[in-house]
Regions:
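Rossmann-like NAD(P)-binding element
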Residues: 86-147
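Glycine-rich Rossmann-fold phosphate-binding loop(s) that bind the pyrophosphate
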Residues: 44-45
Length: 346
């Protein structure tokens, strides 16, 4: 038998990762009365409607309830989407109000204002915090005890707000985080390398926004280090190509909005994926918005980090290895979000 000895550094790293591999109390599950085949969409704008359409096609749910401040809008979307049910699996898509959410397993919030050209980010934060303070107490009053998925931007800030005011265990309040950003990164890398994007493994972490971080140090193509794979493929400009791809991913939303005023299909697919891993209890690792509890020296702020997601929501936070530069950027990203929270008096 061949024995492998860990170096002192490796042993300390393993110990550190064991401490950081945070697991939530499995007893804190949704109540048995919760129907995980029933989902609620609060907000029927571009993102909400595209998501409901995607969920209708997925076959994940038997009931989809639409709620919007404009009841007629919710009714119109539910009617339009329902007419496609004969081409999908049988289910019920309907407009309703908060009294209908009591037994829902999943509530998705996409409601909120969009940032206007003359508005600061802090202006948007104040407006959408006000929206959340009007929505979440309605869920609490009706005893909602399922999983809350926050999509409204700035998603990391609003996930923090939702965790603070909902009364739900923090592992059952999930932000969509950088799930879409990570998909964009995988797509761009796949196009650059000429491989199926599903064979590319890499994460965007930190803020879902301008301070997001592409984790190049652990990026790989089917287990082959990304830089090595580029060399094998005849690419010899690794630093330049990764920088360009990271910028392209970060600016994707701006580029789309400039051309068609809004982004909604990609994020709809990202939300569908989050719902899928919850309903099917897949235990998949997704970079969702989670509360930091000392990992990487960061606490009391929500960041998008790889986490195991299943039927109970966020089941474990996965401490991926970061190099010094990536860890510094993650701390910078957390400080940016903390300042926004402080400026907004949260």
């Amino acid at each position: 038998m061949v024995m492998f000895a860990h170096t002192v550094y490796e042993s300390s790293l393993i110990k550190k990762m064991e401490v950081m591999f945070m697991s939530y109390d499995k007893n804190m599950e949704p109540k048995n009365s919760t129907n995980m085949r029933k989902a609620v969409m609060i907000g029927c704008g571009f993102v909400g409607s595209a998501t409901v359409f995607s969920l209708m096609q997925s076959g994940l749910f038997s009931e989809l309830l639409l709620i919007d401040a404009d009841r007629a809008k919710a009714e119109g979307e539910s009617m339009d989407i329902s007419h496609g049910i004969p081409f999908a699996k049988h289910m019920k898509v309907y407009a309703g109000d908060y009294d209908d959410i009591t037994d829902a397993g999943i509530v998705i919030i996409t409601a909120g204002a969009n940032q206007k050209p003359d508005e600061t980010r802090l202006d948007l934060v104040h407006k959408n915090i006000a929206v959340f303070k009007s929505i979440i107490p309605e869920l609490t009053k009706r005893g909602f005890d399922g999983i809350l998925i926050v999509v409204t931007n700035p998603v990391d800030i609003l996930t923090y707000v939702a965790q603070k005011i909902s009364g739900l265990p923090k592992h059952r309040v999930i932000g969509s985080g950088t799930v879409l950003d990570t998909a964009r990164l995988k797509y761009e890398l796949g196009e650059h390398l000429g491989v199926d994007s599903r064979s590319v493994h890499a994460f965007i972490i930190g803020e879902h926004g301008d301070s997001e971080i592409a984790v190049w140090s652990s990026a790989n193509v089917s287990g082959i280090n990304l830089e090595d794979y580029e060399e094998m493929s005849g690419e010899h400009h690794y630093d330049q190509s990764t920088k360009e791809i990271a910028e392209k991913v970060k600016n994707s939303a701006y580029e789309i909005i400039e051309r068609k005023q809004a982004t909604y299909y990609g994020v709809a697919m990202a939300i569908k994926r989050i719902c899928e891993v919850i309903v099917r209890d897949e235990k998949s690792i997704l970079p969702v918005s989670v509360m930091m509890d000392g990992e990487y020296g960061i606490e009391d702020v929500v960041l998008s980090m790889p986490s195991i997601v299943g039927k109970n929501g966020i089941e474990k936070k996965v401490p991926i290895s970061l190099n010094d530069e990536e860890q510094e950027k993650l701390i910078e990203s957390s400080n940016i979000l903390k300042k926004i929270l402080s400026d907004a008096n949260i």
